[in-house]
């Protein structure tokens, strides 16, 4: 069997080498010719799996090691009779930890604020519910908005109420353009007008959920602290926008070693189900041991002392800013940052909590 895999997928050889010949390719530039005689295709979100890519191929299975599916033309896949799978929730823990790390980097005193600090979570799926749990471990008040999901553990509110009451808003919705609850440009001029000027905004979901022109106008008016891991016009980022952001990272909020490995394992399991193979591999066997920071210690004390060692978010903010040339970060530089990003470990690897 020929298997074509994105060259940046983690542990592909460990999970798939026994099944056939793996060809590693650059995901963003994958062509019909690359996949024509392949039976399985393994991708990330940078590959648009559409009709022109998959028609008249030998493909029987497409696995995407990602939470989202907006890069997959599911209708075209099903029309061609190709089984598909994604890895919903694979890096949800990593994204939740990214958000808390970003907030504590911007304001370390949040560790002491308990319920005086209100975190508003937009989207209560795999990431949102984990973030809610982790935030509550720190004593924060959590409110959430999701038209499809209600969490018993938090206060569920309307979108408008969340915007008005939250001290920080974190976005965790898929990108949708149709229907009553479409998320494209959910954060537009009207949404920004409802936010308090000192409310922190974090987007680690999908870039176009935030209307960039409205965001720029809002920051100019309010000096709002904004953290972006995703961008409306990604992978190109303007220097003007970058200079306005409190923190910027190149779409790596979910890039933990555990998250990457978990994503590949999930599409491996779906692959095995499709082709009738036994599922007998676990990503945990491939991960090196880490220094234990948390066991037997107070959570907040450890975060105060060790957070930058667990994940030095400021370094990766500096890295993306260093890539600016002629007024912008180009696609090639953006992709290189992602490819060369050293995968951090989740808190649980250091003996810490996990949602």
UniProtKB/Swiss-Prot annotation:
<comment type="subunit">
    <text>Homodimer.</text>
</comment>
<protein>
    <recommendedName>
        <fullName>Erythronate-4-phosphate dehydrogenase</fullName>
        <ecNumber>1.1.1.290</ecNumber>
    </recommendedName>
</protein>
<dbReference type="InterPro" id="IPR038251">
    <property type="entry name" value="PdxB_dimer_sf"/>
</dbReference>
<feature type="binding site">
    <location>
        <position position="255"/>
    </location>
    <ligand>
        <name>substrate</name>
    </ligand>
</feature>
<dbReference type="GO" id="GO:0005737">
    <property type="term" value="C:cytoplasm"/>
</dbReference>
<dbReference type="GO" id="GO:0051287">
    <property type="term" value="F:NAD binding"/>
</dbReference>
<keyword id="KW-0664">Pyridoxine biosynthesis</keyword>
<dbReference type="InterPro" id="IPR006139">
    <property type="entry name" value="D-isomer_2_OHA_DH_cat_dom"/>
</dbReference>
<dbReference type="GO" id="GO:0033711">
    <property type="term" value="F:4-phosphoerythronate dehydrogenase activity"/>
</dbReference>
<feature type="binding site">
    <location>
        <position position="229"/>
    </location>
    <ligand>
        <name>NAD(+)</name>
    </ligand>
</feature>
<comment type="similarity">
    <text>Belongs to the D-isomer specific 2-hydroxyacid dehydrogenase family. PdxB subfamily.</text>
</comment>
<feature type="active site">
    <location>
        <position position="206"/>
    </location>
</feature>
<comment type="pathway">
    <text>Cofactor biosynthesis; pyridoxine 5'-phosphate biosynthesis; pyridoxine 5'-phosphate from D-erythrose 4-phosphate: step 2/5.</text>
</comment>
<dbReference type="InterPro" id="IPR020921">
    <property type="entry name" value="Erythronate-4-P_DHase"/>
</dbReference>
<dbReference type="Pfam" id="PF00389">
    <property type="entry name" value="2-Hacid_dh"/>
</dbReference>
<dbReference type="GO" id="GO:0008615">
    <property type="term" value="P:pyridoxine biosynthetic process"/>
</dbReference>
<dbReference type="InterPro" id="IPR024531">
    <property type="entry name" value="Erythronate-4-P_DHase_dimer"/>
</dbReference>
<keyword id="KW-0963">Cytoplasm</keyword>
<keyword id="KW-0560">Oxidoreductase</keyword>
<feature type="binding site">
    <location>
        <position position="254"/>
    </location>
    <ligand>
        <name>NAD(+)</name>
    </ligand>
</feature>
<feature type="active site">
    <location>
        <position position="234"/>
    </location>
</feature>
<feature type="binding site">
    <location>
        <position position="45"/>
    </location>
    <ligand>
        <name>substrate</name>
    </ligand>
</feature>
<comment type="function">
    <text>Catalyzes the oxidation of erythronate-4-phosphate to 3-hydroxy-2-oxo-4-phosphonooxybutanoate.</text>
</comment>
<keyword id="KW-0520">NAD</keyword>
<dbReference type="Pfam" id="PF02826">
    <property type="entry name" value="2-Hacid_dh_C"/>
</dbReference>
<dbReference type="InterPro" id="IPR050418">
    <property type="entry name" value="D-iso_2-hydroxyacid_DH_PdxB"/>
</dbReference>
<dbReference type="GO" id="GO:0046983">
    <property type="term" value="F:protein dimerization activity"/>
</dbReference>
<dbReference type="InterPro" id="IPR029752">
    <property type="entry name" value="D-isomer_DH_CS1"/>
</dbReference>
<feature type="binding site">
    <location>
        <position position="146"/>
    </location>
    <ligand>
        <name>NAD(+)</name>
    </ligand>
</feature>
<dbReference type="Pfam" id="PF11890">
    <property type="entry name" value="DUF3410"/>
</dbReference>
<feature type="active site" description="Proton donor">
    <location>
        <position position="251"/>
    </location>
</feature>
<feature type="binding site">
    <location>
        <position position="66"/>
    </location>
    <ligand>
        <name>substrate</name>
    </ligand>
</feature>
<dbReference type="InterPro" id="IPR006140">
    <property type="entry name" value="D-isomer_DH_NAD-bd"/>
</dbReference>
<dbReference type="InterPro" id="IPR036291">
    <property type="entry name" value="NAD(P)-bd_dom_sf"/>
</dbReference>
């Amino acid at each position: 069997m020929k298997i074509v895999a994105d060259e940046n997928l983690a542990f592909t050889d460990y999970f798939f080498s026994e099944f056939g010949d793996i060809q590693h390719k650059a995901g963003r530039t994958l062509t019909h010719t690359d996949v024509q005689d392949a039976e399985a295709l393994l991708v990330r979100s940078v590959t648009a799996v559409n009709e022109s890519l998959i028609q008249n191929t030998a493909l029987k299975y497409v696995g995407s090691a990602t939470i989202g599916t907006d890069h997959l033309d599911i209708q075209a896949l099903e029309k061609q009779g190709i089984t598909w799978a994604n890895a919903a929730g694979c890096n949800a823990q990593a994204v939740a930890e990214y958000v808390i790390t970003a907030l504590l980097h911007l304001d370390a005193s949040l560790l002491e604020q308990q319920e005086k600090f209100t975190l508003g979570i937009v989207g209560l799926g795999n990431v949102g519910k984990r973030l809610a749990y982790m935030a509550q471990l720190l004593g924060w008040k959590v409110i959430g908005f999701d038209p499809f999901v209600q969490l018993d553990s938090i206060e569920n509110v309307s979108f408008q109420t969340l915007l008005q009451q939250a001290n920080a808003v974190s976005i965790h919705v898929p990108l949708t353009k149709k229907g009553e609850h479409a998320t494209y440009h959910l954060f537009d001029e009207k949404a920004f007008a409802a936010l308090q000027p000192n409310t922190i905004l974090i987007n680690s979901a999908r870039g176009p959920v935030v209307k960039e022109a409205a965001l720029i106008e809002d920051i100019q008016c309010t000096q709002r602290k904004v953290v972006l891991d995703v961008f409306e016009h990604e992978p190109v980022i303007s220097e003007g926008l970058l200079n306005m952001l409190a923190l910027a990272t190149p779409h790596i909020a979910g890039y933990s070693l555990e998250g990457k490995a978990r994503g590949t394992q999930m599409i491996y399991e779906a692959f095995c189900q499709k082709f009738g193979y036994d599922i007998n591999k676990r990503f945990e066997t491939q991960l090196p041991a880490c220094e234990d920071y948390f066991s037997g210690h107070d959570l907040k004390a450890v975060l105060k002392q060790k957070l930058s060692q667990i994940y030095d978010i400021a370094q990766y903010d500096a890295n993306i800013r260093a890539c600016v040339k002629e007024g912008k970060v180009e696609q090639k530089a953006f992709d290189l940052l992602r490819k060369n990003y050293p995968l951090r470990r989740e808190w649980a690897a250091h003996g810490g909590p996990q949602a």
